[in-house]
Amino acid sequence: MTSEAWLERVPAGDIVLCGSMSAFGTIHRIARELLERGLPTVVPEPDGAAWDLATPQRLLHLKRSASMSHLKRVKAKRTAAVLAINVDRHGVHDYIGPNTFAELALGFAHGKRLYLLQDIPEQYEEELRAWGAVSLDGRLEILVSSELQLAVHPHQLSLFEDWQGVAHKPHTPIAA
């Protein structure tokens, strides 16, 4: 194994991005930046043309389905962290809407690390601080360095995988 291969790291898991659909462009831009820095990301599905043409009843079904799909991604075993893209919206600084707050709560309940792109909004300050949410104040490098420090070396993964494949036998004492 070369020294370069030894230094390579595999991210501990996916970073699930969430936020208001009005920030969809920002969500995708940040996902690309994280991917370029070696962190795999998961983004919400975009609202499609079907949403624009849907009846009110169909729209509720589409929203429910999209929410359920993204919530499953938040709680997935391969997810390491949740990043809320809480950009200013409608004059509200550090906006976190109800779906984003639900995704953060689910992430907390499943032991995921929580990050906020901007600061912690006052209305959720107590909960988010209690949950250990990290405010990035727009500095993605905080998330990148934290997540890469938690990354594992490929040889550690292969040792773990090899170990899982070993059949475990009860210990038999050696006769004297």
Which residue stretches match the model-derived regions?
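Conserved catalytic or regulatory cores that recognize and/or transform ribose-phosphate-containing ligands
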Residues: M1-A176
